[in-house]
């Protein structure tokens, strides 16, 4: 949009706002409650009326003479009909000539965006659409700002996120995405409770940030005069609860990570994290298959759904392969990768060479495990469209996971991928207090070497482990990324109601 066109648009909008303010000034003089009444009560929703009366004929409705009270926002004016939108859908209201005259006299006419209450008998138009005859009516809220002209939604993507309230009014797809999100949360919660998990709440502010490798947000507690951190993960508190005897716990809540913005990342995001005693990471993979197929079926009515140009299948058994196997599988023409052995994964010089050959910008403090993960992320992860568990994560990038009995370089850990992105991370928990102590110390050394995302040392958590953590498996599932898949959206901002935004210039 050129500056001239933009200025003209702003001037036109300001003119409309001034006209609407003038109308409201007149309404205040003649109407109760200073033009903002609060005594209208609706008794019906558009969606419910459609379900109950949508199949009835025009004659049947006239005979019924069923009177309803509806309320909502005016989205269109079509001759004598007003299209009214509320939470369940849309329905029309009919104003005969006498009512139209009254509306003009009382309210100086109604505008698109106004919120109105209507009471009257339910009828059906010649086209077969339900409508309510406007026998009683009241303007409940005068909209001072006009809505965007195009009903398919805002064309300015950034404005959709900054003014989500407008986006939700005019964009049905956006509203539906958040309805799906709400259903996903409910379905997950119900599933977990059905499996005898107890829902808990753990602190959002931590004295020591932990439970994940990430840079935290820092705040200050005035009364205690001490720094605190917004949590990056609830893991260490949830495992303390397992030590305390709660064998199955879960939490759905926000995490905060002081990192960049991208189509996959928002600094404030929602996770479902859960822990179950007397289980391992293989049990978790089976559990995840059951959970996700159940959620998809309950929310969408199917375990198969489109994502971009692909169709993803949440039902059945998911593919399983190690990270080492994945980079070999997805790099068939890379001679160095094809020649790799598991022993080579601990050869840092070789791993640096391979990482650079696939365009990874190597940091000097990266370990062999970090190099392997970066090679995987660059060459294999984007190709994992169907549900896939990737196992065989090295211990040096898994400081809270139990070491593999077969090879202590690896851990009993997996990450779950679908649609080319990670959605979940789970593992058999490290319950050896001495090993955990050593790994925390290694993380501190990494932080001192320049790794801002390395973990802090948590002495109280070590004390908890010394009291005895039973064999336990735990997992975190990214709710935002899961909802992206179930709504076929490709940016996390489309599934977060109010995403983080840079300040407007």
Swiss-Prot record:
UniProt catalytic activity: tRNA(Lys) + L-lysine + ATP = L-lysyl-tRNA(Lys) + AMP + diphosphate
Cofactor note: Binds 3 Mg(2+) ions per subunit.
Protein keywords: Aminoacyl-tRNA synthetase, ATP-binding, Cytoplasm, Ligase, Magnesium, Metal-binding, Nucleotide-binding, Protein biosynthesis
CDD domains from the UniProt entry: LysRS_core (cd00775), LysRS_N (cd04322)
Subcellular location(s) per record: Cytoplasm
Recorded GO CC terms: cytosol
Binding site for Mg(2+) 1: 415, 422
Gene3D superfamilies: Bira Bifunctional Protein, Domain 2, Nucleic acid-binding proteins
Pfam families xref list: tRNA-synt_2, tRNA_anti-codon
GO biological process, one term: lysyl-tRNA aminoacylation
SS bond list: none
Cofactors demanded by this protein: Mg(2+)
Keyword field contains Cell division: no
Annotated family: Belongs to the class-II aminoacyl-tRNA synthetase family.
Subunit structure: Homodimer.
Protein name listed in UniProt: Lysine--tRNA ligase
Organism listed in the record: Vibrio parahaemolyticus serotype O3:K6 (strain RIMD 2210633)
Organism lineage string: Bacteria, Pseudomonadati, Pseudomonadota, Gammaproteobacteria, Vibrionales
